[in-house]
UniProtKB/Swiss-Prot annotation:
Subcellular location(s) of the protein: Endoplasmic reticulum membrane
Pathway where this protein functions: Carbohydrate biosynthesis; gluconeogenesis
Keywords: Endoplasmic reticulum, Gluconeogenesis, Glycoprotein, Hydrolase, Membrane, Transmembrane, Transmembrane helix
Function as written in the Swiss-Prot or TrEMBL entry: Hydrolyzes glucose-6-phosphate to glucose in the endoplasmic reticulum. Forms with the glucose-6-phosphate transporter (SLC37A4/G6PT) the complex responsible for glucose production in the terminal step of glycogenolysis and gluconeogenesis. Hence, it is the key enzyme in homeostatic regulation of blood glucose levels.
Membrane topology qualifier: Multi-pass membrane protein
Pfam family, one: PAP2
Record-given protein name: Glucose-6-phosphatase catalytic subunit 1
Encoding gene per record: G6PC1
Enzyme Commission number: 3.1.3.9
Species annotation: Bos taurus (Bovine)
Transmembrane segments: 29-49, 61-81, 118-138, 148-168, 171-191, 210-230, 255-275, 292-312, 321-341
Reactions catalysed: D-glucose 6-phosphate + H2O = D-glucose + phosphate
Length: 357
């Protein structure tokens, strides 16, 4: 088993080395792709846009992103995936020859296990939701036309171009091996396809959101404690990242498994609070919600406010405080874009109801 994994990892190292040597001029492009593919952009950019254009699509997009990333965390704890940037320095596979020289970048040194790729899984799931939802909107109940078939081909072609760029980016940056990004894409598509058949997320009560959030948190913590009791150190990757990363400032606490867990759960719970608030009912369910300029204003205001909000970084000196603030900050994202901003805009534009939450 170990010999087979070494061969697989060596193929990944050779792939990374080949890309870095032959596509040096594409360095900025691959870094940009990796930054754009970060799941944070699904919450801060794609979610508010889709929610105010097609509410159901926005809700599904957020659920797929959150549950997909939660499953990604569990998979990583089970699979113990290596990352190229530390494996090539730790392995004795190259004891009889020189190891390929692998370059590191500011976005290389993530601290969690490597398999499956979170960037690939998140991008695949989120973009799968957008493509299938767009096709469903344009098709309706009519028989597919020639224009629709062309749109279908163009969207799926664009989907796979995006996935290819994300996968190549993660390999180029030495953040993942090829098999990890492939596993991420397939897992993301599976999660998104599953949520195409789940209708209960669109009218879930606050109690349901609370219970699901508690279950996801309890399961993750319980699973972590169980593995720790069995003698498994689930924070083994943090030590490797700190030891093998070229620069200490490139190791970020917000890429640890628990940071990801609490950010996702905060986002999900925040969505539940927002959708079950009176501010949401009075603004997004009122007459103004059908007026396109109002929805467009909500999108623009959400993007501006969330961009400013994203620039606020919780202090990371004390991990517990960092995790709590990360949860609260993430919960505020859907609260702002779903209820607070539409309510304020509706109030400014003369919406008759002026009750608070």
């Amino acid at each position: 088993m170990e010999k087979g994994m070494n061969v697989l990892h060596d193929f990944g190292i050779q792939s990374t080395h080949y890309l870095q040597v032959n596509y040096q001029n594409s360095q900025d492009w691959f870094i940009l792709v990796s930054v754009i593919a970060d799941l944070r952009n699904a919450f801060y950019v794609l979610f508010p846009i889709w929610f105010h254009l097609r509410e159901a699509v926005g809700i599904k997009l957020l659920w797929v992103a959150v549950i997909g990333d939660w499953l990604n965390l569990v998979f990583k704890w089970i699979l113990f995936g290596q990352r190229p940037y530390w494996w090539v320095l730790d392995t004795d596979y190259y004891s009889n020859t020189s190891a390929p020289l692998i370059k590191q970048f500011p976005v290389t040194c993530e601290t969690g296990p490597g398999s499956p790729s979170g960037h690939a899984m998140g991008t695949a799931g989120v973009y799968y939701v957008m493509v299938t939802s767009t096709l469903s909107i344009f098709r309706g109940k009519k028989k597919p036309t020639y224009r629709f078939r062309c749109l279908n081909v163009m969207l799926w072609l664009g989907f796979w171009v995006v996935q290819l760029n994300v996968c190549l980016s993660r390999i180029y940056l030495a953040a993942h091996f090829p098999h990890q990004v492939v596993a991420g894409v397939l897992s993301g598509i599976a999660v998104a396809e599953t949520f195409r058949h789940i209708q209960s997320i669109y009218n879930a009560s606050l109690k349901k959101y609370f219970l699901i959030t508690c279950f996801l948190f309890s399961f993750a913590i319980g699973f972590y404690l169980l593995l720790k009791w069995l003698g498994v150190d689930l924070l083994w990757t943090l030590e490797k990242a700190k030891r093998r990363c070229e620069r200490p400032e490139w190791v970020h606490i917000d890429t640890t498994p628990f940071a990801s867990l609490l950010k996702n759960l905060g986002t999900l719970f925040g969505l539940g609070l927002a959708l079950n608030s009176s501010m949401y009912r009075e603004s997004c369910k009122g007459k103004l919600s059908k007026w396109f300029p109002f929805r467009l204003s909500c999108i623009v205001a959400s993007l501006v406010l969330l961009h400013l909000f994203d620039s606020l970084k919780p202090p990371s000196q004390i991990e517990l405080i960092f995790y709590v603030l990360s949860f609260c900050k993430s919960a505020a994202v859907p609260l702002a874009s779903v209820s607070l901003i539409p309510y304020c805009l509706a109030w400014v534009l003369g919406q008759p109801n002026k009750k608070t939450v």
